[in-house]
Amino acid sequence: MNEVSYKEISNEEEGQRLDNYLIRILKGVPKSHIYRIIRGGEVRVNKKRAQVSSRLHAGDSIRIPPIRL
């Protein structure tokens, strides 16, 4: 991923933790990198910094930064 992307949470994805959701959609990205970008405030949920253990709700907008490994 070379650019910022936005994902909207569907009813089927509701209730998942943010870290588990990102691990599932960002295949090939190490878990340690995913945790680092969440803790660093680069991942936003509804334009706010999110915690690793945040639960997602239907309609939430997730901002995912460019992934550089």
PLM regions and their residue ranges:
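S4-like RNA-binding module at protein N-termini
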Residues: 1-69
